């Protein structure tokens, strides 16, 4: 297995929640020599400095300051959350069996969650003498399972059965004697009295590289941890640029991005403003020279159902990076931003392909459109082609993740200068 693919798998296998994903990326940046900043502190930025900050335990922004006078911001945005089940505040349901009360987070495919080992991960807030403290928590063993109903009892199971999340998707914890044991286990793992929690279910199956040529990768949360990791690696490997490279990994994309740590928040806008203030730069002039790559996975043409794809814009796994288009601006790509990205990919030797929704199958929106309300710069929406988006176990091509790392390294090593009719790419 290629070392870059192994590193991606290691990340996927550790990122059992949005909080664990952020912590892993923060540690990766710290190990690469980046200094952590805190929003409540004064910032002392210096030429050649490498910095990162987090918000809400689940979003991250990193940036580098060039030695010379900066010409603008080169930004990428991805997200670290995934559709899953969130554990309710009072979660124990005790009767003949002990079950867990959960609710859906995001728009998921429900059926793949059933009949497979699950556990819980996220963060808990525990009581301390001075106040409260937030800790990561991951019960790293097979703990729960959502059982299916036998075909003998549900004859419609294979005929378009409609799931009721209040009934069908409650995880089994144990028998009647298990009542009270899971809350006690969580407090034991947390090391104190839990006053609040943000806990989510995750599947126990590890990331897998497979296929006759080992060309595919399957894992939980490829949408969008695959882009988050590849953009981070490209950011770290990018060469010197006269622009300021900025890496953004947001939370809450799967539920509309409206949170203090989502793309719809002030996080990116606040960070860019503080960079400009700290370096005595004109914010308007900097944004006029800036560019954003919004990286969120795309639908590959399905091998069994090609009819769901637009005939002329149907990306395949392993076919290169996907540029996403939409006439109603669900994606922010236009002719200029697409051309800039194509040019950078061409220089890096990376293939690109295109995606449009089929005209009668409208799709969703993503990070770029939402962040533009706060930071209005030319934006290209891209992604990696994948199958089974929003399943708990998704599939993509190994080569595409490597291509995104290569392309973002080339992007972050470039300098973009706005011209009267386009961009100069140095």
Question: How would you label these PLM feature ranges?
Answer:
Residues 1-426:
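N-terminal hydrophobic/helix-forming segments and targeting peptides
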